[in-house]
């Protein structure tokens, strides 16, 4: 998980540095942090947020979901998170990282099986993410 957090921090820092350069265009980044409550209790709000990003794709450079997609690492929450984030497929560039909630109630065991099922490496490695 530390590797993912470092990668997200590096990406955010790179974007901030590049956006501050006068020769670079402005970077328009949408952040989706801690969506676990939406995945668990308010999926319509999460779908609305993601639909907004899709509808404004021409004015968005990148969407970053910052972890904690689920609250309890269960199928029902992963299904909501995956179906919602997949709305952006081929419409707006996006990436995501796992958060501590995504690893289960006892995150010391680091159970990423459901994450791997809903966000398979084969699908996202093709996109270069």
Description of each model-found segment:
Residues 3, 55, 116-117:
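Polar/charged alpha-helical tracts
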Residues 1-9:
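Bacterial N-terminal signal peptides that target proteins for export
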Residues 20-78:
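N-terminal active-site segment of His-dependent metallophosphoesterases
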Residues 75-129:
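Extended active-site neighborhood of metal-dependent phosphoesterases/phosphodiesterases
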Residues 2, 18-20, 38, 83:
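Compositionally biased, intrinsically disordered low-complexity segments
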Residues 9-17:
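Bacterial N-terminal signal peptides
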């Amino acid at each position: 998980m530390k590797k993912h957090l470092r990668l997200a921090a590096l990406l955010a820092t790179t974007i901030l540095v590049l956006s501050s350069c006068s020769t670079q265009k402005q970077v328009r980044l949408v952040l989706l942090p801690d969506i676990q409550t939406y995945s668990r209790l308010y999926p319509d709000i999460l779908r609305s947020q993601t639909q907004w990003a899709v509808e404004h794709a021409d004015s968005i450079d990148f969407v970053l979901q910052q972890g904690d997609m689920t609250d309890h690492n269960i199928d029902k929450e992963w299904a909501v998170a995956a179906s919602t984030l997949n709305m952006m497929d081929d419409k707006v560039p996006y990436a995501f990282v796992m958060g501590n909630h995504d690893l289960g109630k006892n995150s010391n065991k680091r159970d990423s099986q459901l994450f791997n099922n809903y966000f398979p490496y084969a699908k996202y490695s093709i996109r270069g993410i």
